[in-house]
Amino acid sequence: MCSNQYIGQKIRAARKMRGWSLDELHDRLANMPAIIPHVPLSKQSLSKYERGVVIPSGDTLQNLAYVFKLPVLFFFKPFKFTLDDAEYRKTTKMSKSELERIKILTQERLERYFTIEEICGIAQQNIVKTIVKEEKDVYLLAKKLREDWNLGLDGIVNVIETMEAHGIKVIETDTVSTFDGMSATVNGIGVIIINKGFAPERKRFTALHELGHILMDLNEYNHETTEKYCNLFASEVLLPRDVFISMFGQKRHDISLYELRYLQSLYGISADALIYKARKENIISIQRYKYFNIKKNSDALFKAEVEKSIFQNETSFRQENLVFKALNSDLISCSRAAELLSSDLKTVSDNILV
């Protein structure tokens, strides 16, 4: 690909990352502070830059970098991969432009993530899919994962950090509430994108649901069965069936909200998911499960209590930690660290204590 084409692609990508139309980009460039050398640009010129018809001048790229809050170097590095084949889940309709924004943001973040791992000499862990022939295979895979990752039978303290420690890249993104999660395999590496704004219990479940999409070969199943198996996988990794049954018993007529709260605090799984699991394992009857849902949908106070989040929030700082580790080991400069963090020199310098 010639340079003007990928520069154009990166300009378009930067605009999409911000969620701007060409009109919005034009207006922002036109209203830049007077202290910044301003190059007047028409909407038509911007369109030609994005399509690779014309190569922008150095001053123009400086202006674009300013409004996008990106280093000029961003425009000269073509993306090494795409997320065109990513599978995503959403609760309701989400705009195509928002989905594209999420994909491009993820691409840009992953480029920086892979780069710092390469600098630190960290080998990538390629994904090996497991063929699922029946529901039993989902239980077995979840059990094997817990064993392979040395999780024991206790709750997972931080799902995102645990996944990243085992080679899965997890990207949190600020987006609309209709977006649940997305998963992809990039150069053999598992990538998961989740909604940053969700409650901890929902983020944990969604991340593991997406991991199910990555680890399980479910090509022979329809969408409904695929989603069911990924939900089962997430539930089993969070709280294994044997542990769940040992705590609740084989058969129950009722389960108290107090008991649900206790398990929720230990395993970081929502009360709704716990009740569903109790029904799935035949601990409660279908009648009691229906009653629970009817009460929740008709009693606002009960619904609020059931859906209340009580688990600590979680995220991962692995990428940031690797950058500062490389900086303190003299593997990179402060300016390179700022680039890899998509930050500025002052922020990087302020975080260097010794």
Task: Go through the PLM ranges and name each one.
Residues 1-354:
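Active-site hotspot residues in diverse enzymes, especially metal/ion-binding acidic/histidine motifs
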